[in-house]
Amino acid sequence: MSLLERSRMFVHQKAKLVELTNEYRILDEEGQEIGVIRQEGQSTARKVLRFVSSLDQFLTHTYAIYDADGTKLVELRRPAKFLKSRFLVSDGAGMPVGSIEQENVVGKKRFRLLGQAGEHLGTFQAENLISWDFQILDAAGVPVGRVTKKWKGLGIEALTTADNYMVEIDESVAGPFRMLAVASAASIDTALKQDAQGFN
């Protein structure tokens, strides 16, 4: 089964002495690695800038999701920003799929999931002002997925720390909307949540 087709996955941050490049493992419910999320295109100078200041968050960033055999499935590219963020999403071959666009700069975080023609496919939003949990809603506002740090019944509780979370996406979600949902949910800590800091 492709990583993109899974209805449940667990995202676990790889331990680093100094976090200069984000990299997360994607695991199944048995704790087997099924993919990885990796920040790409960072020069040594960019890594140093990230370590010594917060200016790095305003520069262009690229993240990619790979499956277990190293095949690139999704790429997220965030052009340089000041306030609201916009992520351009493409498939592993570089073909545009759509975008993830931040709606607000105050209050609970909310991102629109848009198709390639700009059509509204769904929403990715925080459940409240202080919760880390997020909901995925379809175009009609119906919940079809969730990102949470609260889960039960897994065989990998030993891995649970503040930087781990569970992604659940309904099997009915398909096409570009599913790719955008997986991209936003799987990358919430590496891209969207960290990017929502600073002036946002």
Which residue stretches match the model-derived regions?
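Low-complexity or membrane-interfacial segments used for flexible interactions
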Residues: M1-T62, Y66-L73, R78-R86, G92-V97, ...
